[in-house]
Amino acid sequence: MDKRFYSFFNLTEDQAIAILDTPQDQIGEDDSRYIAASHLVNFNSERSIAALMRAIHHTDPEMENRIVRRKAVETLGRLRATVALPVIRECLSDPDCYMIENAVWAIGEIGTEDPEILQEIMLLLDRSEQTYRVIIQTLAKLDYKPAIAKIKPFTTDESLPISSAAITALCRLNRDFSQMDQIVTLLQNRNVIARRLSIQDLIDANYYAAIPDISRCPVSLVFRLRGIGMLSEAGIQEGAIAFVDIQPYLEKSLIDHPSSLSLVHSYDTLPDLSFLIHELYETDFGRCYTAIKTILENYAESAPEALFNTYEQEAKNDYGAHFHVMKLFPWLRHAPAYNLLIEALHNKQPQFQKSRAAAAIALAEIGDPRAIPEIKSCLTAQIWDLKYASLLALEKFGDRSGYELLANDDDLLIREKRNS
């Protein structure tokens, strides 16, 4: 699990516990019980776990407190606090449907074989206005076969995320994965939520055969890399697949050119450049990739100036558009973007992390050798995709010296790349 963004707040364990224990109506304007509950994920101690359980038992119905209780349950799940299981179990009957969702998820993270708890979770499928997807996923994760009959009707639910989870759960519980092609098909659905969540379902099922399809799915690179990365590591460790089988799909995904994707959007007529630039700010990255492809094919000469303008006006503060702008400059062969790319390469603000790998590859595309030491410095980062992208970039420059720095890297895919 990637935990590098867990600790944003300069709080000690004692400070976080003190804030969390403060009644909501006495909390200072500079303090937040929600932040305190979030921050305690960094302290897997008896004291922190006890404080989180106390927060759950504080049942003030005010919205601020309900949100804190939900977060406390989530944090206990992340800490895999077995001692908290009885307290979390009580939340399965909470009137707050979101609290129930978090409690089910947390029990799945902690794990249990208690048939009474598992039956309680299963019976939540009979409750109206509940988040069924998480319940179904958890029952499958905990391998609760008595839930098969309850889950089956959800395979035809009108909500694609729910039906996808149900189909996947039945495949896992029955040990029969013949229906997983239905989930693979969702990777090309026009509904972006269905596309994103189908990747998670493929991960949950360890469906390694879907790696090529995931690499072509038009969603944010973050979702694709998570799917390819987790499936690849699990498959290689299991001996079911080899690195050479997944390497081309992983590397095409890191390069992230729209030509390697199966796009789900199109235009009836050619839009003007201003419309396409605006599309780079869409939260549905499928639309962004269609816009990028159209810019490259139709506006190669005029696009660089427009991209610089949008960067100065908005994109430097919008992490999605920032990412796309960084990628577009080298594909447009726009060498004056060098300084912007160097800045993006070293930008450690959390929201711009995916732009760093994009900048490394972009700098190699531009081909200015001044970038070599700048890229090489990223090999010591704790971000696997940045390290992998840096290796690809250095290879393009003909520099393979970075491999020696990563001889004993913690990440399996980095080690496999080094040895390939």
From Swiss-Prot:
The source's domain of life comes to Bacteria
| InterPro entries given in the database record | ARM-like (IPR011989), ARM-type_fold (IPR016024), PBS_lyase_HEAT (IPR004155)
Keyword annotations: Antenna complex, Phycobilisome
The molecular function terms of the Gene Ontology recorded here are: oxidoreductase activity
Disulfide bond positions:
none
Any one cellular-component term (Gene Ontology): phycobilisome
Q: Decide whether keyword Transcription regulation is in the record.
A: no
Keyword set includes Endoplasmic reticulum? no
Name the record gives this protein: Uncharacterized phycocyanin operon protein Y
User: What is the organism of origin for this protein?
Assistant: Pseudanabaena tenuis (strain PCC 7409)
